[in-house]
Amino acid sequence: MVDFHKAGEYQYISISPTAQVELGQDVTLRSFVCLEVGSEATFKLGNRVFFNNHCSIRCEHHIEIGKDTMFGDGVRIFDHNHQYSNYHIEKISFNKGPVIIGKNCWIGSNVVILKGVTIGDNVIIGAGAVIHKDIPSNSIVVSKEELVIKERPQ
């Protein structure tokens, strides 16, 4: 069994016996965290990584997270997605790409990090952003989506 420094309630942790896993010291998982590491995957966590409530990490290929990185509520990390094809769903496989997150990062609530992304060191990502391309070190990322407000017809 994987031993975490601090663990909240009701986690779902599924790590294949053939996965390559490295955990740093003082890793904290709050409540309702989901961690899945597949059979051919590599998953590495640095020291003092903190996952707040309701985070989900799905590793089928390679996810690496540097030391002293914090994740807000509801963060999702995926190193794979479904491959689109016209086949029946049971025949569809995954497209995979590594996710590398540097050290000393702060990932805000409800951020989604997609496959094939490298996030440098000392990065802050604001709440609700969808990260689908690389972020250089020492950056601040905010999701700037316009709010469309229309009058409701009577």
Each model region followed by its residue ranges:
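Gly/Ser/Thr-rich helix-start
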Residues: 109, 127-129, 144
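Short, flexible, glycine-rich and Lys/Arg-enriched loop motifs at helix boundaries
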Residues: 40, 83-92
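Glycine-rich NAD(P)-binding loop of Rossmann-like domains
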Residues: 90-101
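Domain-scale signature associated with acetyltransferase and cell-envelope carbohydrate enzymes
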Residues: 1-78, 102-104, 111-113, 121, ...
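A generic "structured core" feature
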Residues: 114, 120-130
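Conserved SAM-binding loop
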Residues: 64, 84-86, 118
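Short helix N-cap motif at coil->helix boundaries in the Bergerat
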Residues: 133
